[in-house]
Every structure is written in C-alpha cells, then in structure tokens.
Amino acid sequence: MTAHPLAVRLVEHLRGGREIRVLEFASGAGRNTRALREAGLDVTTVDDRTAASAAPFAGVPDGFAAALSTHGLLHGTPATVAGHVSQIARRLAKNGMLYATFGSVRDARFGQGERVDASTFAAAEGDERGVAHAFFDRAQLVALLDPHFAIESLEEHNADEVAGKWAHRQRPLSGAVHWFAVATVLETRR
C-alpha cells in the first residue's frame, strides 16, 4: 500500500469492517483515498481546494468512525487549524478516531519565508510558495487537541523519510518534521 503510515494505521484499526465511514480532510492526489477504499472503507473526501475554502465542512455529514488528514492540518494559522480540528471532532461518531499530521517547530521550514504570526510562515518558493504553514511544539499541539480529543499517541517524525517525493511534486522535503497524532474524540464534543 503506497499510503501514508497514518492511513495504514487507520486501516489496521478498522480492519475487517465493511462500509465503515471515514472522513479524509484535504485528500491531495488520492493515494490515501485509494488505500482506504481498497480496504473496504466508505470514504468521504474534502479535496484540497475545498479544505482551503472559507467553509470547508459545508455539507459534510457526521457519524464518521475515523478522520484522516495527512497534510491538510499543516496549512493555515493555528487558529485555522484549531477550527478544522473542532469541525472534524463534531463529525466523528462516539469513539471516533483522528489520524492526522501537524507541523513541528523542529521542521526546517519553521521561521523561513513570510512570517504570518509567531507560529505560521508562508513558503517563499517551491511547490507551496505563499502557502501558510502552522508549526507547533508538543505543549501547543496538546492544547489544540485536548478540548476535543483524548490523545492516544503523539510522535514527531522526519517527513523526508516518511513522505518523500511522492507527497511533493518537485522535490522531496528537506528537514521536514511532522507530528503524527492519533486521538479519540471526547464524548462531550460530539
């Protein structure tokens, strides 16, 4: 399966279930979507253009067993990312799981490009020129997730080794570090 490691973990978690509903936020080129569907999951996608719009969750139903975002929550300001996380939490069923990546302050791109705010920088060149990226330290990311989720695991990974060129058109990432988060929605947030 040429899918992101978090997509693989999601499939392993939901293995054996058929027609289980999964929300994929910012589905990119569809690599993860294909892997999820091949596993028999019923996938609703929010494409990249919609994810970047003013109302990315308009028309998205609720009741999903899991949500996956392997790059959509890297983009925007911390406030934008927090809003997306809240909207995802509202769309998960009881015990629904979030599998997502977030930018780390250890990423080589942190502090590079145009400063949007203390935690957000827009790339000055390359595939993502002008695209704002939010970066978090562990405490900031825990604070962002805690109102909505019980964190199961939160690990930093070298994205160069995990994603490489398949996730970025022109060249592999260089010095990219992402948080991989797996979390269960809190009952009070549904």
Feature names for model-found ranges:
Residues 65-80:
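A short SAM/SAH-binding and catalytic strip from SAM-dependent methyltransferases
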Residues 82-94:
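A short glycine-rich, Lys/Arg-flanked "PGG" loop and its adjoining helix->strand segment in the class I
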